Amino acid sequence: MPPKPKQKAKQPSQQPPPPPPPAAAQLIEDILSSDEEEGGVKLPTKSSVKNALKKVKKERDRELIRQLKDQQDMELEALQAIFNDEFITMDPIIINRNMDTIIEGIKPIRESARFRITIKPYVGDDEKCFVSIYLVVGFPEKYPVVLPSIQVLVNKGLPQKKAIELEEKLIRESQGKIGNIMIFDLCEIAKDFLNENNFEPTQSIHHDFRSHQQKISIEISTNEQQQQQLQQLQQLQLQYNNDTKKEWESTLEESQLKEDRKNYRLQKSIQRAQYEKERKKTIVNEFTNGPQSKLSKQQRNIDYSIDHSINNNNNNNNNAFNNFNNNNNNNNTNNSNVSSIDNKTIDKQQTMILHLLRLLCQNDSNITNDHIKTLGEQLVQMGIFNRNHLSLLNMHNSNDNQIYQHIFQDYFLKQFNDISLSDLKNNVDSAANNSGHFLNKFWDTLNKTNENSGLKKSPSTFEYSGEGGGGGVGGGSSQKTINPHQQSRYHSDFEEIQLLGRGGFGQVVKVRNKLDGRYYAIKKIKLDSNQSLNRRILREVITLSRLHHQHVVRYYQAWIESAESLSLTNDNSDDDDDDDDEFESGSESEESQSESESESSESEESSESEESSESSESEESEESEYSDDSEFESEENNDFDQSFSEVFLFQNGNKRSLEFDLTDDSYSFLHSDCGFLLEVFDLNNKIGGNNTRSMGSSNQHLQQQQQQNQSQQQKKQPQQNQSQQQKKLKNSNSKSKSKSKSKSKSKSKSNSKKSISSSKLKNIKKSTSIPYLYIQMEYCQKILRNLTETGMNLEDDDIWKLFRQIVEGMAYVHGQGIIHRDLKPSNIFFDSCGDIKIGDFGLAINNKTTSTLSPTTNINSSTSSAGSLTTSSNSVQSVINTKQQQQQQQPQNYWEDEVEGQQQQQQQQQQQQQQQQQQQQQQQQHTARVGTLFYTSPEQEAGTNGDSAYDDKVDMYSLGIVFFEMWYVFSTGHERVIVLRNLREKFEFPSDFERNHSRQATLIRMLIDKDPAKRPSAQQLLQSELMPPKMEDEYIKNSIRVITNPTNQFYQTMLNSLFSQNHQHLHSHIYHHQQSSVTSSSYSKSLFCSLDLLQVKQLVDDVIITILKKHNANEMLTPQMSIIKEWNEQPNLFNNSSSSSSTTTTTSTTNTANNTNSVVINKSTSTSNINKVSNKTGKSILMDDSGQLLELRHDLRVSFKSFIETEFLNLGDHYKHHHQQQNDVRHDNSSNGNSNNNNSNDRHHDQDKSNTTTRSVDEILELLSKAPIKRYEFGHVFRKPHLVGKLPKELSQFCFDVFGSSSLYSDAETIKVTTEIFDSLPSTQNFYFVRLNHFGIVEYMWKFIGITDLTLKNEISQVVSQLIRQPWFTVKKVLLEKFKLPLKQVERIANWVLVKGTIPDVLKKLDASQNNNPLLSGNGSLGNNNNNNNNNNNVRISSSFTDLLEDIRQLAVYFEKMSISPHKVIFDLSYCFSENFYSTGIMFQVILKEEKHECLAVGGRYDSPLNLNNSNNSSSSSSSSSSNNNNSYNNYNNNNNYNYNYYSNCYLTNFNLPITGLSVAMDKVYSRERELYSQKRRQQLPPTLSSESQMIAHKFSTPDIFVISLGPNLFLERIGIVGDLCNAGFNAETMYIENPTPEEQQDASITSGALYIITIKEKGAKKTIKVKNIEKRREDDVSRDEIVKFFTLSNFNSKSRLNI
């Protein structure tokens, strides 16, 4: 209900009008006075006075309303400008009369305008705006004379009482402003009111209490935090002062402490050396002389614990180790502390020696357990270890590694991993050497090592070197073992055979699979802790997994393992020590902290240096000093270990396979063949040899790895320093601080080798396991580089074959979007069959990301290219030196500048970030320039930075160099450098090369062109004439010749193979899926189509058929498929009549081909053009099991045309054969004379009878011209599917054709049928127009524009025809830019195609153009001026442009007589697309007036030329037969003087079959009608059943009457009623359930769509029947006997509701 103040506001506007003004009163007095003067006694009546007053009042009101309207419009514009988006217009309303207004006599109010304004208070921020309203105002017609309608609606926050109060206030204010503009003032008043009441909405008391508590708690916490910060600041200031003071004090004592520590270390080292010397002598004496001492007892305890642990399971190992510790502790109580430590060291030292000996023996398969036991006995006699320890040398014991792990867990840098001994056990040689040979080799190696090192060969010396290096070696060995709980997939599945190659990235090993026994190549790559580098490494795996080609190395699988076990590839040569420095024992033995006890304590104390005591500091200093003294012994032991390993590994002379020799037969995916960094492109430094370059690549890659490791440590060091400083401030421990400072300074004075080894040691400690990537690939025995170096002793054809294989492989790689970037002979391999395999995709990248490499990708690229790319030694070394200086100077700077605190750390971090950015930039630049010397293109040298991006043409440049090396052999390496440099820079070939290999030289020049755009792609190279033909191509051609010959004996075998079911299962799932999910566009073909689709199709077809029946059209069906006549159609428009068919059918199995020996179809205008249209949309070609090609019809009109042509060809053959018999009869009569008159008369009688039944072609055409054939057809046409295995696309189409008449009336009738059809359809009537043009006018247009090329015509016409949907400037842009047409030519096109309108309007424009253009006003024939149409006698176009316009005028007259609206036919000259489909005359389209301008139908004249000339035949046999016939005819004419011209002209003349027709896309029509019908259905159904989901989806017809029953046992009654109705001709239906529920029957009756529902009810013994009319909503009671009579008398029409 509206508020009461609103009613009050309407009262002023409803007051009676004011009295008339004085002018009106004077007018009334004048009227009265004039009446008195004229009439004398006559007085005016009351009616005249009232009428005069009414007129005056009306004129006054109209003038007033006009003035007020202008004033209202001005106010509305001002308000809209002021409030902008807050002003919204509304529809005005009329307040009708109610009881109150009728009683008071107030007239209804009519508003002229109504609007709404959003009012907010005067608040700047929306967050503080808590209230807002909508002020709705309505202007009466007499506003502002009367009050406006004002209404206040709450938008936000304002209570309803306040809104009523504001509305009353505004009404009161408006009463005082009558006659003036007031809305803006009212808005200001409303804003003031809202500003006063702009309060935050009130909430509950609990919420207010909670919010208040939160505010108080926030304030309290803020105060506490401020106090805590203040206290912390004071404490920091106090600690800073104390620390500064202590720092200065410690600095004064620094020099003294330094000297004391040196003296202390020297003294301790001397004492320890003397003690060790005495202790070792004692041990030797005890073991050699045989006295049993406490030490032996202790040793027996150890042996017991070890043996016990060996016999038990793995779970008892901890107990064994605990027993060992307990026994150890018990024995130590009887001795001094120093002796107990030494005894423990001796026991562990002996165990370590045994472990090292066992590991060394595992690498030699010729060593047996007997050999090891003999060697152990000799070592026992020397006193190296106890006899009870010999059990640890058992190579088949798998539990020993766990014992070593428990004993040496304090000395190992990483946890022990188990080594798989089962693999090595299988490789033991049964025919081993004798023990003497093995033992002599062992001791000879030891003697040689001691001689080289200058030491004595005493047992004490060997024992001491084992002590010094044992820890290091043991640690190194521990790195190469695997956890017993982790099974190595690599060692369990594969057996290593040979190392094929090694690079900076990893190794490639030849292995044998233990399961299948085949050989493979496995690439082992060590992964980095940096995830970005790992992603770069894994890029090769991803690339290989995408490639599957016969000339690309096959990829099998890849996996990652956490570590790598010992194998022949792990003990590398000297040049690989730097590559795997973290795994080599030599690199660890170089470290000074290699002793077991000292190394452990130093590592523990260095991690807890801030919390350690002064005593631990002294111990650490002692041990570090000892490490410096023992460094020489460690190096000595390292040399011994290396020499010993080489003897064991390379005893058979196979050490050469592990070297980086580039001249051997090694196979490497990471071959460093002439690797280089293009930024340092120095050829003189690369001449030294391949081995030197390869070694440099490995060393530089090592430097890059060291640089990355150091950078990672440098990132973590500031954080560690910061945490250390915080601990110092809290603990205030100046001693630990001074200790750290002294420690850092002592470390900075160590040599560079020691600092590098210590950094390696830290990296090893941090990483518990290092993952390896294994890539299993195809094993190839040879590489192309071996052949190019020694010379390819092959025939020229074989070299071309190999080159073609390389090109095919690169074409496939480039087709996958991959750039190899490192194509060279070392990366091209041969398989076992001698075919090419392209490999090493370590540098391959995606072609799309070449020009936009991210910094991360560039960094990764630099890492991945280490295998085939040598970096700049100067640049890399400078970066490494900078990093080392930073690591050395950073601790000093930190402790010297510790006063500056956090500021110094921030500066260091900023410097580190800047250096890292510079390093990334350098790496990005270097990475972009990847490749191999002499094989990189100029754009590769320039890199990818900036605008010089490269693509797959860089591989083609490399291919050119490779191709040159395949034809030319270099005598020396120096010659190779000079020749390749001249070839790259100057394009100069060696002498006699270009003369002997001219084709090769041309091809090489193309490939190494400096402009990438001029280089051919791999696909273009395969198709080039410079490439010799492929042998496989010749095989294919020969096979095609065989299988296309039906007389060949293998022809039927080939067909049986093609039609076998071996491959049908590959496409069966696609076929069945399409059958089940994608229904055909022909709705009648769908078994489960919905109800409305079937109804719409039936109704539309009935409407069209009704219209066609009125035009006397009959249904004539054409075959859906036919024998194909042209497989590859070559558009040959306007051929000469004498020319034969371009292509003919390859088989002669049909009767049609046999019977058309003298009658062929001339491939002239329409046939070729129609075939071209078919080619564009795609024909559906099928083949039967006999090899016959069949074509599914593409268009109903084309099918009808082919059908007519075939019928007339058969007619011509029949007519010719008939007259041939007549000629024979006449010939017989002339020879026999008149001997038998009776027989002659009978024969003439038969001839006359045959003449009456046989007609010629021209006679039939003459009859059809008077009464043409009108036919229609509803059918389906097919299009070629887009995917293999799918069904051809099926479309519904309707066509109407008029055959036999050349008159324009047939064209007009076709368009008349078109308009009647679309006018009868509700979805298209008044929403379409006919787009008309003439074929002859289009041809004149092309002649006027100056375009003669047929292809260009079709392309331009396709663009120009889009003017109905696109503006001219868009079409003009395409013509200028895409087709490159001159501007004048485009302007000429515009003068034609922009002309459209009704037929009279366009004719006026064309007449004017004809007068101004001599080309159009001439009388020349179009056919004579058009070369493409010079002999087309069948074209029915006029000879001049004037005649063409007369045709259009005549057509317009026909339209007028047929009552076709002139506005429905648009003469559009831009409609020129598909004009080649039509041969002559009119062509038109039916276009919807909607935005998309969709085409629903096309039509026009497509006459078919028919040539019955027997001189042109499709086969030689027919030509010979026809020539014989001609000779016989000529002889007959000459001999008998018979006039044969009549008969010869009957079939020696070209005929024209006139056809005009219409094709309608029924799918589009069905869709539109279905949508409209569905809307009507939803309106008819109740709201509860109006949804599509509740409608019947699987029913084929709609009943008119539906019978239901309410009660049991009425099923038979329902069936009886349905039967009676059906017998009477009504469509009745019921449910097929005997006793359904009433609800089910009610739903079924409604959803069925029936017009009438019969309900049967049973009340006692009586049965009542009610008939309900759904449309009229009426029910009638009908008896059982009168049901049929009821529907008969009701004039029931079953389809009245469905008429369209």
Swiss-Prot record:
Catalytic machinery residues: D822 (proton acceptor)
All residue ranges annotated as the Protein kinase domain in the record: 494-1027
Biased composition (Basic residues): 736-752
Low complexity: compositionally biased ranges: 697-735, 850-875, 1135-1158, 1230-1240, 1509-1531
EC number of the protein: 2.7.11.1
Broadest EC class assigned to this enzyme: transferase
Name of protein: Probable serine/threonine-protein kinase ifkC
Organism: Dictyostelium discoideum
